Amino acid sequence: MTGSDQTRAKLIDIELDESIGRSTPDVEHERAVAIFDLIEENSFQPVNDSGAGPYRLKLSLAEQRLVFAVAREDGTAVVTHILSLTPLRRIVKDYYMICESYYDAIRSSTPSHIEAIDMGRRGLHNEGSQTLMDRLSGKIDIDFDTARRLFTLVCVLHWRG
């Protein structure tokens, strides 16, 4: 990919389905950080897109499925991919539980206990990110860092929904 292609194969806007509502302050903070980081640095290219990015992404849940609605910068629809949440459900549930433990530990535990929980949290996050990359394979090309940030947003949607 040339330098010009790399600047175009990216997301410039991410929207989460707001109809699901708000969550806890900790979850909302994770959402805001993930969106900021994702827009700052990402690699995102719908497979077989004859046009060019940059892209806008709307993430939502519909009938227990994850919806990736991709549009061009001007809002023109590119593609919508609907993925089953089943392969991610256990990871998201476990990740949510370990995040609750992590947030509780931050407030009251020793640094070594917090670090141990955080290592487990990162491991689950990596597993979820890889699963998301695998599910998007052949549909949307993303790198691992982009998958990590998208997985955070999938978790936020799931926690709200």
UniProtKB/Swiss-Prot annotation:
Family per similarity comment: Belongs to the UPF0262 family.
Q: Name one Pfam family in it.
A: UPF0262
Protein name per its UniProtKB record: UPF0262 protein mll6455
What InterPro entries does the entry give? UCP032146 (IPR008321)
Q: Which organism is it from?
A: Mesorhizobium japonicum (strain LMG 29417 / CECT 9101 / MAFF 303099)
